[in-house]
Structures are given as structure tokens and as C-alpha cells.
Amino acid sequence: MTMETVESQHDGSITASLTESKSAHVQTQTGQNSIPALAQVSVAGSGTRRGSPAVTLVQLPSGQTIHVQGVIQTPQPWVIQSSEIHTVQVAAIAETDESAESEGVIDSHKRREILSRRPSYRKILNELSSDVPGVPKIEEERSEEEGTPPSIATMAVPTSIYQTSTGQYIAIAQGGTIQISNPGSDGVQGLQALTMTNSGAPPPGATIVQYAAQSADGTQQFFVPGSQVVVQDEETELAPSHMAAATGDMPTYQIRAPTAALPQGVVMAASPGSLHSPQQLAEEATRKRELRLMKNREAAKECRRRKKEYVKCLESRVAVLEVQNKKLIEELETLKDICSPKTDY
């Protein structure tokens, strides 16, 4: 058998040659070693290319060797590698998601612990107010509403706290309630509640302030932000010269004794503009004109006095200069007398 016939058989049917070689090899094994081996088959794989088919070497009894290309191909390794890479990526993503969730849970726990350890504003305010005597401490009040969490406490904080010259502390709440604390009192027990009410009986522009009690001397003075009311004893009536004037941007208010229509313990305070009638305005204009004329007369007197002093100063200077002039004239005459005989010789 030549190489051309083997190659033609290989081109015709590779499968038939393989089956024949396998059957011949089986016959050699079962023939009790009486018949010599027909062919010796050895399989060798070519590693030149990735994924190339294996080559079978068939040795005939005559000593010829035939290269037969196998039909069965080796599995492609890239398929397994791609699947492995895919599984690794998915596992990494799952791990990152789990780690992110665990970190988020840890951060939320830490934040809750920090918030629970943080001191409340009421505690800070109570510590600050405990240093100053007479400042009322803010008490915590638990809210009874269903929607409010139990850890949240509500309190009524005054909008502003003022201290008078006598040492009293005045707290004005948002609802218009005024609380007065004496210097010797401690906490909320020394506070006096005042309620601002409006009435139609007083003239427009007036503000009514009602207070519960009075101090030992019977006089109370404090400032109310917004209306700027100055409250004093209800039995006293202030004259225009004793009008309570507030400093800064706070206007002046005059306190009048309560009328019969007002209840006991109510003081009416009105601004000066609302109390002026046309007659009072005319009197005020006359008073201002007289005051201006008086100031002009005083200024004219001062100007005349200064002019007289200036004239006297000038007269004294003229007298001094006249004396000096006379002395100079006498000296000049003496010099002339001394120099005249020398010129004659």
C-alpha cells in the first residue's frame, strides 16, 4: 500500500480507517499470538496551536507510518476560564454589597450611640442657669402626643430674658405671657404671671398690662419687647417731666392711673402721640417757639459778650503799642542829638 492510496482513503473516510485499525488490533489480541500484529497505533497531540485536533500515527506491518488526523477535538480551555471569571466577578460583587450593608448598619448604630450620649440643650441651659442666681431653670416636660417619640421632650422657652436695674428678671414667652422673678427668688416660684389684654375702652394706641402682685416698695418697672410698655404703681400718675423714657429704639410711654371702667390691678400705658389733643399740640408748639427764642437770646448775649471782650483786647493792645511808639520816638531824638555835633566838625 502506497502513500497515495492512504491519503485517498484518508480523504474519503477517516472514520472507516479508524474502525478497521481498531478491529485489526482486537484480532491480534484474540488470535493466541499466532497471527502477527497488523498495525501499531500511537496517539500524539500537537501543541503548536491552541484548540488544534490531535494527530494519530498508524504503523503498518511493512514499516510504513501513516499520520491520521483525529475527528475528536480537545475541549477549548477558554470556555472554562470565562465561566470561572464570571463566577469570580459575581462573588466579588456580592461580597461588596454585603460589606456595604454591614458598614451602613454599623454607621447607623454608631450615630445612634453618639446621639444618645450627646447632652441635651435643656441640660446645658440648666447648667448655665445654675451659675447665675435668680435665673429660672427650664424643666423637662414629656409630650403626651401619640406621634411624638418618648425620647423627645417639649418645653416652653421664653423668647427673651431681661434684667432690670433693681435686679429683677423678666421672661417674655412666645404667647405673650410675661414672668417676673425677684432677685432673691429661686427658680419658678418667684415668677409673677402677667397677661397682656386688649380693651376697647382705652384710646387707640394704648396698651394694657395686667400684673398679679407688686413689690415691697409698691413700684414695678419693666420693658416689654414689641410694645415697650413701662409699668409702675397703679396709684401714681406720672407728670410729663417724669415720663418714662426707654433707651435705644424703644419709644417713650406715659403711665396714667386706671379709670373706673378698668378692673383692679390694670394699668393703661399709652404713647405720647395718642394723648396729644389739638390744644396740647398748640401749647407744645408755643413752648417750643419760646424755647427757641430763649436759646436765640442766650446765643446773642454770648456773641455780644465775646465781641466786647475782643474789643477790650484790641484797645489794650493799641495802648501798649502807643507807649512803645512814644519810647521809640524819644530814643530817635536822643540819637539825633548825639550824632549832630560830629557832623558839624
From Swiss-Prot:
Post-translational modifications reported in the UniProt record: Isoform 9 is ubiquitinated by CDC34 and RAD6B in order to be degraded by the proteasome. Stimulated by phosphorylation. Phosphorylated on Ser-116 by TSSK4 in vitro.
Top-rank taxon: Eukaryota
Chain intervals for the UniProt region annotation (Leucine-zipper): 314-335
Boundaries of every bZIP domain copy: 286-345
Keywords of this entry: Activator, Biological rhythms, Cytoplasm, Developmental protein, Differentiation, DNA-binding, Nucleus, Phosphoprotein, Repressor, Spermatogenesis, Transcription, Transcription regulation, Ubl conjugation
UniProt GO BP: cell differentiation; glycosphingolipid metabolic process; negative regulation of transcription by RNA polymerase II; positive regulation of transcription by RNA polymerase II; regulation of DNA-templated transcription; regulation of transcription by RNA polymerase II; rhythmic process; signal transduction
Cell location: Nucleus
Tissues where the protein occurs: Expressed in testes (round spermatids) (at protein level). Isoform 14 is the major activator form in testes.
Annotated positions of the Phosphoserine modification: S102, S129, S271, S274, S277
Domain KID intervals: 88-147
MF GO annotations: cAMP response element binding protein binding; DNA binding; DNA-binding transcription factor activity, RNA polymerase II-specific; DNA-binding transcription repressor activity, RNA polymerase II-specific; RNA polymerase II cis-regulatory region sequence-specific DNA binding; RNA polymerase II transcription regulatory region sequence-specific DNA binding; sequence-specific double-stranded DNA binding
Function: Transcriptional regulator that binds the cAMP response element (CRE), a sequence present in many viral and cellular promoters. Isoforms are either transcriptional activators or repressors. Plays a role in spermatogenesis and is involved in spermatid maturation.
Similarity-based family: Belongs to the bZIP family.
Designated name of the protein: cAMP-responsive element modulator
Origin organism lineage: Eukaryota, Metazoa, Chordata, Craniata, Vertebrata
